[in-house]
């Protein structure tokens, strides 16, 4: 006997995942960072880790790796050696959320990191999905090589502006800053320094 319309409707409603309280109020705090001498201070580090429901050590390790620097947690703050823009840190945190927080199946943040047999897995409490944690590759800018090197000269086209007014180019996992360049404007630059995933340049045209 085939199931009735009412039975099918009931089953469909059962499979619908209701929004959780965590999902309803999930908003990643904007990083509040400032330069202090030769260091950069992320003053709301603890708040960000708490909102993401991730261990501070795990988030800090990711930030240090992406910035390519040393640092430490001081109370509710994180302190990094070197000078980094607030926008750079926000970009890295967004990548962390995509890789280690958001479920790739339902797009919800109700997840946990679970390590089984040396494999770190992201498990979703909302839909039951799970996946091995892997860094997602950013969209590669076809106008540039995927592995930039210091001293390289290339043509790039900024995609948007930083708060300081510099042009910003995303190349794979790298963020490049170009002075005096507007979005959509192709310019020739030389890579002067690479710090982690941040590329510093100078104009050569």
From Swiss-Prot:
PROSITE patterns the UniProt entry points to: TRAM (PS50926)
Molecular functions (GO terms): translation initiation factor activity
Source species: Methanoculleus marisnigri (strain ATCC 35101 / DSM 1498 / JR1)
Protein name per its UniProtKB record: Translation initiation factor 2 subunit beta
Keyword Protein biosynthesis: yes
Xref: Pfam families: eIF-5_eIF-2B
Positions of the TRAM domain: 147-205
Subunit text: Heterotrimer composed of an alpha, a beta and a gamma chain.
Key words of the record: Initiation factor, Protein biosynthesis
Family membership noted in the UniProt record: Belongs to the eIF-2-beta/eIF-5 family.
Function according to Swiss-Prot or TrEMBL: eIF-2 functions in the early steps of protein synthesis by forming a ternary complex with GTP and initiator tRNA.
Top-level taxonomic group: Archaea
SMART domains tied to this protein: eIF2B_5
InterPro entries on file: IF2/IF5, NA-bd_OB-fold, TIF2_bsu_arc, TRAM_dom, Transl_init_fac_IF2/IF5_dom, Transl_init_fac_IF2/IF5_N, Transl_init_fac_IF2/IF5_Zn-bd
PANTHER family the record matches: EUKARYOTIC TRANSLATION INITIATION FACTOR (PTHR23001), EUKARYOTIC TRANSLATION INITIATION FACTOR 2 SUBUNIT 2 (PTHR23001:SF3)
């Amino acid at each position: 006997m085939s199931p009735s319309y009412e039975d099918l409707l009931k089953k469909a409603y059962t499979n619908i995942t209701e929004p959780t309280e965590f999902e309803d109020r999930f908003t990643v705090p904007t990083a509040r960072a400032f330069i202090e001498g030769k260091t950069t201070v992320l003053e709301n580090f603890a708040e960000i880790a708490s909102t993401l429901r991730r261990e501070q050590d795990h988030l800090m390790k990711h930030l240090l790796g992406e910035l390519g620097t040393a640092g430490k947690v001081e109370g509710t703050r994180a302190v990094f050696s070197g000078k980094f823009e607030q926008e750079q840190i926000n970009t890295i945190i967004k990548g962390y959320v995509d890789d280690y927080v958001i479920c790739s199946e339902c797009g919800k943040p109700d997840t946990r990191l679970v390590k089984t047999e040396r494999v770190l897995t992201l498990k979703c409490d909302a839909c039951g999905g799970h996946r091995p944690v892997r860094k997602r590759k950013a969209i590669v800018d076809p106008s540039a090589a995927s592995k930039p090197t210091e001293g390289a000269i290339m043509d790039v086209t900024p995609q948007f502006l930083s708060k300081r007014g510099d042009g910003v180019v995303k190349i794979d996992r790298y963020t490049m800053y170009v002075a005096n360049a507007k979005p959509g404007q192709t310019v020739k630059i030389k890579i002067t320094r690479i710090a982690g995933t941040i590329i510093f340049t100078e104009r050569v045209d």
